[in-house]
Amino acid sequence: MAHFAKLGKGNIVTKVVVVHNNIATDEAAGIQFLKDLYNEPYSVWVQTSYNTRGGVHKTGGTPFRMNYAGVDYKYDDVRDAFIPPKPFDSWTLNEDTLLWNPPVSFPDDGNRYNWNETNQTWDLVSE
């Protein structure tokens, strides 16, 4: 199955849909199918890879456009990549993965945490 992201103003993803590989034999065919399906000849669609995150293809294939697109992601046409929305003001974009990094690394002790933007800390989630 092929996945496509519909872009709105500012190249922000507004929708992600799946198209069967028999229809989307390549990116151009998938885009034309979606324009016809939605009767939106001027809409902008970009293919995205379900298996790509942080520039790594999780099944060992070739990474495609750095990250699988989601609603509110931005398509950067210079990088030819999808960038997720910035989760917090203090986080910075990792130029190698195009994912957002917190100013303090996530604890690796197996517990669940939430980011506390005010204190710039990871707060343990109590259950």
Can you say where each PLM-predicted feature lies in the sequence?
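Interaction-interface detector
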Residues: 1-127
